[in-house]
């Protein structure tokens, strides 16, 4: 494995352990490996494996009722033959975290199983092994595996024989826990069994009835659960449909049903979860490309046909939607505002906001997303105090894809250039909003702060206050050490030299580095200025002197300057004298001369004189001096 691959693996290990790794550095290393490696090398395949794993996890975590169709398409674009182990592990982990999403993941598996049956077979094997393991250890969380199997049966991915055997096992020696699991299973699968396996369904209810009347070991809660199950059955399972309408995505003819029994000898194939070098990598990729074309090609043609029919029928309506008038803009802004204000949580708000642009073209989506981000920031600025509710909304939107990330970067630059238009309270809220995005590492610092030049000429009081609130929010969330680590990253250092002048500093911009040091010291972040202080301290002496003289000359008033020279020669001797006179509007005057020996005298009238004597003499005087005959005096304009 090369140095690049080893470094990339080390960065991934650091990131997985919770330590901060600059995304730009990770991405640059990925690009370097992709450009320098071939598909037959191990480091290239490792990189592709890591990218596949992150892409699968991202799509699974984003999956919900509203976007499941889009998620299916995105997953089929990935090589599921190679990554099916990663996919199953990610789905089972997500389902175990929240059982409410089990029907959604079951619907996702049903669609994938209809095209790639190996996916359905693998998840059933792992769920069965997981149920056995937890049941033998007498763990109640075996219910999660059983519920997932139930919903896969409802989706016809698995035969109902497996769940009937599980129910028989639970009711053979009933306990309070086994009855609770059994009732929960029957609530979810009862309607399916009533329609497809009547005899087995009646047998289960007869067994529950006998337990209710004859078994004295069960508690009142278990009796109550059994009674409620009979009521649910009497009502026709109205609250428990087999498949929700929005999750019924596969036709019966297309579904692949797997036959599995409780005591079957199955393998989990855990080796599919880890990287394995593939000597025929290119050939296998081409094979899956053909599978991908077969799967997505048909759906694309159907979409094109349906879109063509809709365009012929609703051509006028489409034209009206594309005509974005001012009233439509105001209505859209109002909708965004009401959505943000009426949501109970940030997750709910993001979900509703994304649905607003669900059926828009890419160009319309981008424009509307810009308006949406602007409205979120304006809603945040109107609050009396900053609320992290808005920061979390921005964080979730910013991390969705590159388009959203670019919109947030452009919006930050726009607000930085117009921040003087806002009041102090709004300015504080906006600063803390962007500070949260930078602290959460969802917004790239190196792409956002490159427009900031912290100088007296290029900033105003509002922009400096804005910067202060950004840094204060970042320190509250990640601490001063975390902030220093990010600012010390090489990529960030290059792009933030206007904010922290540390590279290429000369006497000409020494005042800028002093201004930056004074600013961060004044807001209590002097620790960030240590390197800048060293840079300023190590400037060459002549450069520091010139910088002071330049600044001093800019404060001077009007001046006059005269010079005269006289030469006289005698035998074997030569003498030259020069006199200068300069008058200023200031009340203080100086006279001086340069030579090898010097004497200084100060008078009470605040005048200085220096004199020297040598073969060549010079004298300088602030007051007008006598000029040799024939010389002219320069008069100030």
From Swiss-Prot:
Record bears the keyword Transport: no
Amino acid composition bias (Low complexity), ranges on this chain: 548-576, 614-626
MIF4G domain mapped to chain residues: 53-236
Domain MI: 331-453
Job of this protein: Involved in pre-mRNA splicing.
Region spans: Disordered: 538-637
The entry's keywords: Cytoplasm, mRNA processing, mRNA splicing, Nucleus, Spliceosome
Source superkingdom: Eukaryota
Family: Belongs to the CWC22 family.
SMART domains: MA3, MIF4G
GO terms (BP aspect): mRNA splicing, via spliceosome
Description of how the protein assembles with itself and partners: Associated with the spliceosome.
Compositional bias annotation for Basic residues: 577-593
Main location: cytoplasm
Name of the protein described by the UniProt record: Pre-mRNA-splicing factor CWC22
PROSITE patterns linked: MI (PS51366)
Keyword Aminoacyl-tRNA synthetase attached: no
GO CC, one annotated term: cytoplasm
InterPro entries: ARM-type_fold, CWC22_splicing_factor, Initiation_fac_eIF4g_MI, MIF4G-like_typ-3
Localisation per UniProt entry: Cytoplasm; Nucleus
Gene Ontology MF: a single term: RNA binding
């Amino acid at each position: 494995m090369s140095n690049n691959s080893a470094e990339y693996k080390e960065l991934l290990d650091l990131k997985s352990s919770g330590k901060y790794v600059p995304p730009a550095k990770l991405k640059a290393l990925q690009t370097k490996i992709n450009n320098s490696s071939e598909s037959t090398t191990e480091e290239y395949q490792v990189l592709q494996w890591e990218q596949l794993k992150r892409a699968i996890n991202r799509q699974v975590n984003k999956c919900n009722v509203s976007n499941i169709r889009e998620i299916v398409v995105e997953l089929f674009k990935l090589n599921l033959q190679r990554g099916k182990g990663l996919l199953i592990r990610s789905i089972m982990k997500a389902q175990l975290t929240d059982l409410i999403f089990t029907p959604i993941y079951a619907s996702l598996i049903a669609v994938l199983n209809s095209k790639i049956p190996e996916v359905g077979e693998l998840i059933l094997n792992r769920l069965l092994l997981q149920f056995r393991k937890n049941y033998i250890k007498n763990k109640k969380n075996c219910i999660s595996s059983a519920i997932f199997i139930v919903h896969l049966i409802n989706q016809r991915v698995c035969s109902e024989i497996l769940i009937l055997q599980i129910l028989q096992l639970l009711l053979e020696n009933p306990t309070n826990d086994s009855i609770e699991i059994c009732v929960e299973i029957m609530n979810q699968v009862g309607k399916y069994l009533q329609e497809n396996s009547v005899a087995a369904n009646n047998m289960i209810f007869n067994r529950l009835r006998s337990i209710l009347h004859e078994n004295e070991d069960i508690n009142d809660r278990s009796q109550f659960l059994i009674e409620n199950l009979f009521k649910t059955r009497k009502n026709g399972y109205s609250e428990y449909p087999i498949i929700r309408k929005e999750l019924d995505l596969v036709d019966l003819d297309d579904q692949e049903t797997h036959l599995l029994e409780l005591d079957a000898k199955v393998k989990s194939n855990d080796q599919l979860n880890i990287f394995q070098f593939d000597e025929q990598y290119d050939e296998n990729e081409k094979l899956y490309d053909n599978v991908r074309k077969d799967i997505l090609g048909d759906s694309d043609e159907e979409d094109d046909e349906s879109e063509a029919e809709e365009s012929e029928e609703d051509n006028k309506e489409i034209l009206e939607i594309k005509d974005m008038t001012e009233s439509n803009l105001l209505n859209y802004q109002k909708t965004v505002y009401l959505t943000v204000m009426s949501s109970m949580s940030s997750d709910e708000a993001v979900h509703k906001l994304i649905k607003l642009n669900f059926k828009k073209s890419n160009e319309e989506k981008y424009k509307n997303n810009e308006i949406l981000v602007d409205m979120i920031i304006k809603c945040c600025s109107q609050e009396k105090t900053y609320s992290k509710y808005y920061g979390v909304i921005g964080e979730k939107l910013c991390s969705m894809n590159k388009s959203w990330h670019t919109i947030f970067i452009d919006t930050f630059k726009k607000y930085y250039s117009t921040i003087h238009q806002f009041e102090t309270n709004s300015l504080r809220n906006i600063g803390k909003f962007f500070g949260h995005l930078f602290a959460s590492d969802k917004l790239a610092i190196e792409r956002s702060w490159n427009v900031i030049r912290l100088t007296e000429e290029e900033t105003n009081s509002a922009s400096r206050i804005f910067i202060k609130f950004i840094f204060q929010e970042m320190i509250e969330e990640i601490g001063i050490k975390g902030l220093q680590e990010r600012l010390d990253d090489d990529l960030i250092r290059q792009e933030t030299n206007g904010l922290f002048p540390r590279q290429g500093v000369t006497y000409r911009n020494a005042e800028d580095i002093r201004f930056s040091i004074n600013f961060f010291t004044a807001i209590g972040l002097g620790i960030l200025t240590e390197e800048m202080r060293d840079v300023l301290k190590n400037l060459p002496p002549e450069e520091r002197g010139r910088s002071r003289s330049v600044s001093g000359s800019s404060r001077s008033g009007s001046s006059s300057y005269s010079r005269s020279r006289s030469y006289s020669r005698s035998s074997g001797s030569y003498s030259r004298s020069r006199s200068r006179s300069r008058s200023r509007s200031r009340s203080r005057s100086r006279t001086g001369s340069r030579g090898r020996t010097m004497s200084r005298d100060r008078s009470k009238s605040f005048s200085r004189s220096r004199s020297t004597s040598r073969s060549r003499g010079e004298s300088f005087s602030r007051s007008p001096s006598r000029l040799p005959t024939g010389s002219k005096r320069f008069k100030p304009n």
